[in-house]
C-alpha cells in the first residue's frame, strides 16, 4: 500500500498512477520490450527472443537449400504445424517398414555378442563368485607367463649352489675317510676292489 509519508509519487491523474506495491518488480532489462500487465514477463521475453531468432534465421539460410526451422512463434503456419508434428506426433511419423537387405549372419553375430556381453556383465556384478568368466573376454597370455617352468628361477649364489650340491643324493665324495683319519682316494679303492673281488 502506498502512503504519502513513504515519499511515494502522487499525481492528479488517476489512470496514470500505479501504486508501487502493484508495480511488477525488476526482473532484468530486455531492450525494446515493455512489460505490460496483459502478459507475464516470461511470455513477453520469450516472444521477443523468438521474434529476434526468426529474423536472424530468415537471413541465415540460402534460398532452395536447408529451408526454415520449425518453431511455434512464426507468421508462417506450415512451420508451426511442422513443429507440432515433430513434438506431438513424432511416433506417428516413424517408418513402419523394416529393411529387407540386412546381413543375417552379421545380425546373428551381433546378437550373440550382445548376449555374451550381458553374461560378462553379470559376472562382474556377481559378489558370490558362483558365475564363471566368459572365455570370449579373457585376454590372451603367453604360455611361459601362465605356466612358468620351475627351472626358470633367478640365479643362485655360489654358497647356495655349494649347499645344494652337498645335500643332493647324487653327490659322491671322491674319498673315503677311515676311523684312523686316513683318507683314501677313489682310484685306490677301485684297485683294491679289483684285487679283493676274487677272494675265496
Swiss-Prot record:
Signal peptide: none
GO CC annotations, alphabetized: axonemal A tubule inner sheath; axonemal microtubule; sperm flagellum
Subcellular location: Cytoplasm, Cytoskeleton, Cilium axoneme; Cytoplasm, Cytoskeleton, Flagellum axoneme
Keyword Cytoplasm: yes
Tree of life domain: Eukaryota
BP GO terms, sorted: flagellated sperm motility
Keywords for this protein: Cell projection, Cilium, Cytoplasm, Cytoskeleton, Flagellum
Keyword Cytoplasm appears in the UniProt entry: yes
Pfam families in the record: CMI2B-like (PF10629)
Family, similarity comment: Belongs to the CIMIP2 family.
Subunit field text: Microtubule inner protein component of sperm flagellar doublet microtubules.
Primary role: Microtubule inner protein (MIP) part of the dynein-decorated doublet microtubules (DMTs) in cilia axoneme, which is required for motile cilia beating. Binds to the intra-tubulin interfaces.
Entry protein name: Ciliary microtubule inner protein 2C
Taxonomic lineage of the native organism: Eukaryota, Metazoa, Chordata, Craniata, Vertebrata
Amino acid at each position: 500500500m502506498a502512503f504519502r509519508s513513504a515519499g511515494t509519487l502522487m499525481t492528479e491523474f488517476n489512470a496514470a498512477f500505479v501504486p508501487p506495491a502493484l508495480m511488477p518488480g525488476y526482473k532484468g532489462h530486455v531492450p525494446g520490450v515493455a512489460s505490460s500487465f496483459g502478459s507475464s514477463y516470461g511470455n513477453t521475453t520469450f516472444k521477443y527472443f523468438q521474434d529476434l531468432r526468426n529474423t536472424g534465421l530468415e537471413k541465415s539460410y540460402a534460398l532452395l537449400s536447408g529451408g526454415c526451422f520449425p518453431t511455434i512463434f512464426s507468421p508462417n503456419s506450415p512451420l508451426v504445424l511442422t513443429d507440432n508434428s515433430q513434438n506431438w506426433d513424432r511416433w506417428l511419423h516413424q517408418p513402419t517398414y523394416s529393411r529387407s537387405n540386412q546381413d543375417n549372419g552379421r545380425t546373428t553375430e551381433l546378437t550373440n555378442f550382445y548376449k555374451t556381453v550381458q553374461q560378462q556383465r553379470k559376472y562382474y556384478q556377481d559378489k558370490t563368485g558362483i558365475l564363471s568368466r566368459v572365455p570370449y573376454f579373457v585376454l590372451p597370455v603367453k604360455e611361459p607367463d601362465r605356466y612358468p617352468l620351475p627351472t626358470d628361477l633367478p640365479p643362485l649364489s655360489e654358497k647356495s649352489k655349494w649347499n645344494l650340491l652337498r645335500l643332493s643324493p647324487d653327490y659322491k665324495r671322491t674319498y673315503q675317510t677311515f676311523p684312523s683319519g686316513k683318507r683314501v682316494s677313489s682310484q685306490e679303492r677301485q684297485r683294491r676292489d679289483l684285487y679283493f673281488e676274487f677272494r675265496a
